Amino acid sequence: MLEKDIKKILFSQEDIVTKTKELGQQLTKDYAGKNPLLVCVLKGAVPFMAELIKHIDTHIEMDFMVVSSYGGGTVSSGEVKILKDVDTNIEGRDVIFIEDIIDTGRTLLYLRDMFKYRKASSVKIATLFDKPEGRVVDIEADYVCYDVPNEFIVGFGLDYDEKYRNLPYVGVLKEEIYNK
């Protein structure tokens, strides 16, 4: 039923799991013995985080944030709002933000700077998807599974108007769906 709204599939579930496993193995090496705090940016990063933690073979802790810069459309508003902050004291902690996609970069620049101000020992960014063409600020992820074209993609947590997050793959949404 949802497939009819997808122009083309970019990454299958198998593709995503394979890349996520590779990232988990890298994080295991990079953070062995360090107990990093993984901060999942809700809602979109939930499937990525759930898959990723299965492949990290060292102690971790998790926390969650709700951050908004879209408000329901397809274009970032430019204003970052913290709707739910972390519960964990991050002072002196190694923090890894787990994000579904980096587009403009505004949200993660804001979060990175905020956590540095809160005296995190280190702040890194792991994203399933990076859209470099959309960037409007100077920020890069430390860990990227895939670079994606400047198209509106959905699935595996990515949504349009809270829909399509449950697709097990990632595809390009047909323009007529969001240009109604």
Swiss-Prot record:
Major localization listed first in the record, in broad terms: cytoplasm
This protein's pathway: Purine metabolism; IMP biosynthesis via salvage pathway; IMP from hypoxanthine: step 1/1; Purine metabolism; GMP biosynthesis via salvage pathway; GMP from guanine: step 1/1
Positions of diphosphate binding: K43, G44, R165
EC number(s) on file: 2.4.2.8
Cofactor names: Mg(2+)
Active-site residues from the entry: D103
UniProt KW Oxidoreductase keyword: no
Compartments in which it is found: Cytoplasm
Annotated catalysed reactions: IMP + diphosphate = hypoxanthine + 5-phospho-alpha-D-ribose 1-diphosphate; GMP + diphosphate = guanine + 5-phospho-alpha-D-ribose 1-diphosphate
GO biological process terms, semicolon-separated: GMP salvage; guanine salvage; hypoxanthine metabolic process; IMP salvage; purine ribonucleoside salvage
Keyword Cytoplasm (UniProt): yes
One Gene Ontology term, aspect cellular component: cytosol
Top-level taxon of the source organism: Bacteria
SUPFAM superfamilies xref list: PRTase-like
PANTHER family per record: HYPOXANTHINE PHOSPHORIBOSYLTRANSFERASE, HYPOXANTHINE-GUANINE PHOSPHORIBOSYLTRANSFERASE
Role summary: Purine salvage pathway enzyme that catalyzes the transfer of the ribosyl-5-phosphate group from 5-phospho-alpha-D-ribose 1-diphosphate (PRPP) to the N9 position of the 6-oxopurines hypoxanthine and guanine to form the corresponding ribonucleotides IMP (inosine 5'-monophosphate) and GMP (guanosine 5'-monophosphate), with the release of PPi.
Family note: Belongs to the purine/pyrimidine phosphoribosyltransferase family.
Protein name as annotated: Hypoxanthine-guanine phosphoribosyltransferase
